[in-house]
Amino acid sequence: MKLDLGCGNRKREGFIGVDSSPDCGADVVHDLTQMPWPFDDASVDEVHSSHFLEHLDGAERMAFMDELYRVMKPGAKALIITPYWTSVGAIQDPTHKWPPIAEQSYFYFNAEARQRLNVAHYPIRCDFDLAFDGTLAPGMEQLPPPQQAYAKSHYFNTVFELRAVLTRR
């Protein structure tokens, strides 16, 4: 089973679309802030979620990740796409919630990182391996890698989207 969580009107082909709106053509109408989701434990092979997570606050993100972990099979991957924290897209939409999302936001969803950060007491149970990629602004991909790295760490609107791949441990 492959899920497109928060699919809106752009459900990914080959995926079961899940959204809270009955008007967007989702296959499953469900509010993803309401737990449990209508899927069995360890039943999902792949997840896609584009521009949904930024609409959740911190507590909702923790619950979302724990529920994501519950429904995913061990070794399953989830691609989560959000506006990058230094892009105007992260803050322009009044329905986006605080805080904006960076790579470091995901460290809380890895058990070893929670230990290193001394936050193992947080109410988070999930444990994902993490990998990241980003969508660069037009023209940035043509710069040499050292200049790209400098721009990413010093300039706004260099990276538009963060693409996080979470693998269930």
Listing of model-derived features with the role each one plays in the protein:
Residues 38-40, 57, 102:
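GHKL-family ATP-binding catalytic core of two-component histidine kinases
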Residues 45-60:
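A short SAM/SAH-binding and catalytic strip from SAM-dependent methyltransferases
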Residues 33-47:
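A short acidic, Gly/Pro-enriched loop at the edge of an enzyme's catalytic core
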Residues 2-36:
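Class I SAM-dependent methyltransferase SAM/SAH-binding core
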Residues 34, 54, 108:
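Active-site micro-motifs of SAM-dependent methyltransferase domains
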Residues 16, 28, 40, 48, ...:
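Conserved Rossmann-like nucleotide-binding pocket used by diverse enzymes
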